Amino acid sequence: MENPPIDFETAEFALRRSWEIHRQAFGPILEPAFEENQQVRILLINALNHISNRDVKRGMKLLKEIHPHCIYDEDKAAWTFFVGLCFEMGGAREQMLQWYENAAKFGHRFYLPFMKLAKAAHTQAQFQKGADYYKTAIDCLLEMSENDRDEVILGSAYTNLTSCLTMLHQYTDAEKAWMEAQKYPLQPGADATAAILYAAMQNAEKTAVHIQQLKEKFPGWVAQTVEMTRQILDGTHPAFPVEK
């Protein structure tokens, strides 16, 4: 029995489509990787397809095959980052942090490792570390040309920096970060961050403005934000004690 003919055109289209999907997700850290070795790029696309489908074991196996071909810093940055992504998806936090930290060493312009590290620190209430990583990610993004820059990520980074600085009681810097955030597209829940900031600054009027905007844009967050800002304004929230 003869094998069916290979439709190379369809196969090439599938590869290009997969590459574009991953490029949109991972941007600058992916685009320059293995630029001179298309066979390795095909392996990388295959690895990312498996990782995105949560087949982390197969994805990691393919990454191991790719490792000997890491020649340039761009290759090493991408490879190291995606190993970190495997550990993240596998729930191995310590290994994830180690690999993302290693990826961050291969070029300041790659913002993704810093965003991953920032969010990890932020969710663990390590606000100073989170703020520092967000600042570095912002620097990376601002170094890019306006055409290449992801303004949604930039708006998110500034908003999360605002949150970290608010929790550190660095209100002047937090408000500056919020002013910068508003220059870019913001997530629907961003007004919750602003409401908490202004409550911490004891500005009830601005707090109310952002809660109203939250009601219009992201009503699912209204109740918890109203309660938190009420406690902050009343001086009963443990993270924002009233100075006597």
Q: Where are the model-predicted features located?
A:
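Short coil turns that delineate tetratricopeptide repeat
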Residues: 71-74, 108, 142, 185-186, ...
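"A position-specific structural signal for the A-helix of alpha-solenoid helical repeats
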Residues: 38-41, 45, 82, 116, ...
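Terminal, low-structured helical/coil segments at or just beyond the last alpha-helical repeat
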Residues: 208-244
